[in-house]
Amino acid sequence: MASLGAILLFAIASLMHGRPIHSDRKGAKIPLAGSNLGYKKSSNMYGSRLFQGMRYPPSMIQLYQTLILGNDTDLSILEYPVLQESDAVLSFLQKVSCVVVGNRWTLSFDMSSISSTNELKLAELRIRLPSFERPQDVTVEIYHTKKGQENLFMGSFKTNPSVAMGSSWKVFNLTRMLQYYLHQGEQFTNDEYIEVKNLHEGAKPQVIKRRARTEVEEGLQGNKDNTPTSSFPTERVVLVVFTRDKPTANHFGSPSLIHTVESSKYVMSESTVRVADARRHRRNQKTKNTIIMNTIPSRSAGNPLCRRVDMIVDFEKIKWGDRIVYPKRFNAYRCEGACPIPLNETFKPTNHAYIKSLVKLYDQEKVECSSCVPVKMSPLSMLL
């Protein structure tokens, strides 16, 4: 009987432990670990397991708290204006632990998600420094690494690991280093590297010529001098990048059919046509100017020409707000208006759309009007 009573007591205690608290209260909150904010409980089948087991970079949580609470004082002088202009904030953890060889630190990140079509507003390297017996100058080397590819050395800078009292984090401005990598990466050779001194003070990087690249790759290739090595965990280092989408001059990256036709030797110029047959040229001048010069015809039936307009997607309205923490909405854009006939390069048409518009120019009933389709898509960074 005593053993049976113990079993029943244990079962009751287990049920009491597993019983939801205040489950009937509307708008129950699930607190996020490491913060005093709460999020609405999910209405899906996963329930409270939505955020279970998830780990968030502390810097991103702090930034999210700043956005929600509107506490601009927590932002640095650089972050405040940049945050207002940025479309996305990306965070990168180290691919491997920081390798410390003597006074040289080697940091590796996979920055493949940073596109050259994005305008880089700010890049901050945040390091939670370990305890040192005595401060000493160190050289921090930054690498771009991706599985199956050779590590790309991006640059280095010198600093002192000492931090201000009451803070264990030190922030470095790597904006110029990443801008060089994004915009001049094709000219980057094995003999060069970028040395950034006092970068957090706004100094410009200097390209230094090196004949031997092994000197800057010691941290990743091995310790040849038997210098004492150490490391600290990946979560102590995070790279935070603020970006903004920018329009590109050519979405396709290669000459379109219109450019190919214009540069063809079989296409006669307007002056050649006029010399060959002046009468026929005058009779068909309007049509030829439309095709050869790619002029935009006037608006038909008072409809505005096709253009990109805003289309705000609100996750709260589509019932996804309880799962998506940030952003709560974004601009997906859409096309509005009538396409001209024929299309010209201003609207960046595909070859199929251009041919289709030419067919419609001569036979209105044979094909339907061209329609806009996305020509460029980019991932949206979200905190779930």
Curated annotation (Swiss-Prot):
Q: Where in the cell is it found?
A: Secreted
Disulfide cysteine pairs (residue numbers) = C306-C372
The pro-peptide lies at 19-283
Signal peptide range: 1-18
User: Per the UniProt entry, what is one GO biological process?
Assistant: gastrulation with mouth forming second
**What SMART domains would the database entry show?**
TGFB (SM00204)
Q: Which residues are glycosylated?
A: N71, N173, N344
Domain of life, source organism: Eukaryota
List the record's Gene Ontology CC terms alphabetically. Answer: extracellular space
GO MF term list: cytokine activity; growth factor activity; morphogen activity
Domain text: The pro-region is necessary but not sufficient for wnt-inhibitory activity. The central region is required for muscle induction activity.
Q: In UniProt terms, what function does this protein have? A: Cooperation and regulatory loops of multiple nodals are essential for mesendoderm patterning in early embryos. Essential for mesoderm formation and axial patterning during embryonic development. Activates the activin-like signaling pathway to induce dorsal and ventral mesoderm in animal cap ectoderm. In addition, also dorsalizes ventral marginal zone (VMZ) tissues during gastrulation. Induces muscle actin. Appears to act as both a short-range and long-range morphogen. The unprocessed protein inhibits bmp- and wnt-signaling.
Q: What is the designated name of this protein?
A: Nodal homolog 2-B
Q: Which gene encodes it?
A: nodal2-b
